[in-house]
């Protein structure tokens, strides 16, 4: 899930105030290249100095070598370090998982990318014969984004009233469509979380099973992502995890680690770890999830314009400062910011989570962490 308060979605020195922790190799023989790890650690420490985050955890992969890095703490009281492979809410990185699921159904002949959405969900959307599945996956359908509406505040104090509310996909879409389409379908790009709620409904309409069930059977289980889940209403994060916060107008921090994920649905509800995200990225680029022709469809992009990069089918493609092309996604949900990117050859991968103190994070510092993993 992405909101305007988080800025564009993609997507500190070790001794500073005792906030940062040394890199933690996954195995002694698998330490990542020192220069890259040091560059990433420095940018993570810089993120901590912005004062908007309680902690950061990252997993940097270069070839068959991995390094886990941490900075800050699991809670704002500073008593516990960020878990080395703690669980976290991944926000809109969920969109990559749901898009992969749809593309698998395309490969099975059960969905056509250029079919009108009305073929599968008749009566749900206006212009149902003009809006295609591809447009929805690519945010070019013109569907209004519900997270920009007053009915769905997803940042800081206003969000507290909705924190434990149980939403339905149908209710979210119905409310979003009280606004007209933002533009003529297929003519522009505009990020729409509502569109990805529709994607979840599409998966259920075609398979007879919830998007959570299909993602679990098609992606999570085959890849052995034992610490990844797609909750429906459960408010808990299982296993060790850092805590996320929002900041009230009076300066008080509220722990929002426990929340009802239904507000994010198939566009942002999933939970994972950096280890599992790394495995997922590897599965994506090595053909374990999609046939080459379908992965190629996923990478057909349109310009995002509001930020560097282009958008495919649930996938961001962008160039780093040193010219390396990477693919992946950023994600935000109250309390957490996530990023997961890989080079196309899979040689370098980054999975990273920030447990926030407030929703207004320093996005320049966040972007620097991504860039430093690929351009030391």
Which positions does each model-derived feature cover?
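Secretory targeting and sorting signals
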Residues: 1-31
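Catalytic loop of the DD-peptidase/beta-lactamase superfamily, centered on the K-T-G motif
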Residues: 2-6, 28-69, 255-376
């Amino acid at each position: 899930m992405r909101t305007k308060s988080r800025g564009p979605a993609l997507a500190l020195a070790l001794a500073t105030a005792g906030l940062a922790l040394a890199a933690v190799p996954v195995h002694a023989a698998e330490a990542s290249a020192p220069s890259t790890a040091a560059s990433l650690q420095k940018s993570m420490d810089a993120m901590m100095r912005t004062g908007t985050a309680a902690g950061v955890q990252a997993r940097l992969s270069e070839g068959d070598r991995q390094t886990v890095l941490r900075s800050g703490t699991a809670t704002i009281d500073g008593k516990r370090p960020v878990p080395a492979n703690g669980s976290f809410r991944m926000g809109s990185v969920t969109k990559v998982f749901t898009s992969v699921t749809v593309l698998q159904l395309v490969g099975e002949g059960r969905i056509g990318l250029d079919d009108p959405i009305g073929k599968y969900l008749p009566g749900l959307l206006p212009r149902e014969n003009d809006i295609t599945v591809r447009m929805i996956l690519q945010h070019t359908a013109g569907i209004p984004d519900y997270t920009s509406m007053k009915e769905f505040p997803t940042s800081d104090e206003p969000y507290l009233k909705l924190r434990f509310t149980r939403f339905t996909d149908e209710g979210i879409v119905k409310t979003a469509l009280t606004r007209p389409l933002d533009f003529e379908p297929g003519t522009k790009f505009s990020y729409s979380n509502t569109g990805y709620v529709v994607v979840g409904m599409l998966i259920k309409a075609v398979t007879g099973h919830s998007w959570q069930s299909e993602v679990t059977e098609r992606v999570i289980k085959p890849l052995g992502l034992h610490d990844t889940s797609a909750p429906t209403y459960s408010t808990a994060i299982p296993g060790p995890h850092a805590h996320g916060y929002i900041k009230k107008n009076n300066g008080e921090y509220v722990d929002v680690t426990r929340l009802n994920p239904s507000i994010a649905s198939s566009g942002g509800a999933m939970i994972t770890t950096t280890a599992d995200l790394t495995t997922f990225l590897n599965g994506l680029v090595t053909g374990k999830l999609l046939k080459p022709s379908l992965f190629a469809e996923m990478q057909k992009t349109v310009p995002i314009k509001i930020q560097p990069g282009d958008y495919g089918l649930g996938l961001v493609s962008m160039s780093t400062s040193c010219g390396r092309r990477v693919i992946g996604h950023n994600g935000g949900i109250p309390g957490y910011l996530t990023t997961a990117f890989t080079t196309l050859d899979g040689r370098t991968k980054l999975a990273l989570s920030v447990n926030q103190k407030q929703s207004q994070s320093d996005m320049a510092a966040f972007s620097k962490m991504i860039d430093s993993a690929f351009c030391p």
